């Protein structure tokens, strides 16, 4: 408790582990994901940081980064990388895009912190309440109409004294310059918009530098790597999923383990479906003679088999 953050970060050490699968494949997919958003040079620098440090934060949900713990975490990661000799111009993050819009980091809208306001914190939604169960990875992007509605709500809250004029002015400027920018609006989904929004946000964090915090949803990266593996018959992932005896042993070993399968009772599941409401639902492996399928029930009560 008596140390500065910089002193504490200087004591952190990361021990690189050997590759289970070729790391260059991951770096290729990182470059391919970020290039359309930021260009080949920035995407390449992001991959180079990962190659040099082999370490990044995976602690955050994929959402426009307004929530205070998210901002603190990303800044700390930035500072740690700089203690390791990086310039901090590009800081990569892996984030989880599967949470719902009603998650506690509030991907449904903006969390506004204002110490001069009566409540100290204000929520300004972009998405309607009826979409609260939708998955962040699957919803459409923040539209100009959504931004206008949020700004109207902000003006009402300002008149009520729930938000200071100074904070309201900063928020309106952010909405006009970032959320309504061509860079953000040409992205069709909230998942893509989040990658651009957070890079633009981080460039406003400091007065002496303008780093880009590059967020990549880990589900997108995982899907791309799985597609690579499935094209190679001998790949580890394909062997685990499609060789029946290996799959059975894996399911048995991991059933009930925290963070893994828990059978038909509760907890997490390895496979998920996504229905037309953009809601996630668990899919469970069902095996019969000579065949395997994934089965579940979506949020509409419909039986689904894959």
Q: What are these regions, as identified by a protein language model?
A:
Residues 66-74, 99-109, 225-232:
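A short acidic (Asp/Glu
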Residues 40-87, 92:
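N-terminal catalytic cores of NTP/NDP-binding nucleotidyl/phosphoryl-transfer enzymes
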Residues 193-304:
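Extended, H/D-rich, highly charged conserved domains that either
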Residues 58-62, 93-99, 217-221:
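An acidic- and aromatic-residue-enriched active-site/binding cleft used to recognize and process polar
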Residues 87, 91-97, 305-306:
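Structured mid-domain segments that build the active-site/substrate or prosthetic-cofactor binding neighborhood
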Residues 94-199:
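Internal, well-ordered alpha/beta segment that forms a basic, Gly-enriched binding/recognition surface
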Residues 1-63:
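N-terminal regions that are enriched for targeting/export leaders
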Residues 78-91, 117-120, 207-213:
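Structural alpha-beta junctions
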């Amino acid at each position: 408790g008596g140390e500065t953050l910089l002193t504490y970060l200087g004591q952190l050490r990361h021990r690189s582990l050997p590759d289970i699968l070729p790391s260059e494949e991951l770096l290729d997919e990182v470059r391919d994901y970020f290039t359309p958003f930021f260009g080949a040079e920035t995407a390449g620098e992001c991959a180079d940081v990962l190659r040099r440090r082999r370490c990044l934060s995976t602690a955050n949900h994929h959402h426009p980064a307004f929530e205070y713990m998210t901002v603190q975490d990303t800044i700390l990661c930035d500072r740690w990388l700089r203690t390791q000799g990086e310039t901090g111009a590009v800081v990569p993050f892996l984030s989880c895009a599967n949470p719902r819009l009603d998650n506690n980091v509030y991907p449904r809208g903006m969390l506004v912190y204002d110490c001069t306001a009566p409540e100290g914190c204000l929520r300004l939604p972009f998405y309607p309440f009826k979409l609260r169960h939708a998955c962040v990875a699957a919803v459409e992007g923040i539209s100009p109409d959504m931004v206008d509605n949020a700004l109207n709500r902000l003006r009402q809250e300002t008149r009520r004294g729930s938000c200071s004029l100074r904070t309201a002015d900063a928020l309106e400027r952010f909405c006009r310059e970032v959320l309504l920018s061509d860079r953000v609006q040409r992205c069709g989904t909230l998942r893509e918009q989040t990658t651009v929004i957070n890079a633009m946000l981080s460039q406003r964090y400091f007065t002496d530098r303008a780093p880009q915090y590059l967020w990549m949803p880990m589900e997108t990266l995982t899907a791309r790597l799985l597609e690579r593996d499935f094209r190679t018959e001998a790949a580890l992932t394909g062997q685990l999923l499609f060789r029946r005896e290996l799959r059975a042993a894996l399911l048995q070993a991991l059933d009930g383990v925290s963070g893994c399968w828990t059978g038909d009772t509760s907890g997490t599941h390895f496979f998920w479906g996504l229905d037309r409401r953009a809601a996630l639902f668990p899919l469970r492996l069902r095996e019969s003679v000579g065949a395997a399928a994934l089965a579940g029930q979506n949020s509409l009560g419909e039986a689904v088999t894959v």
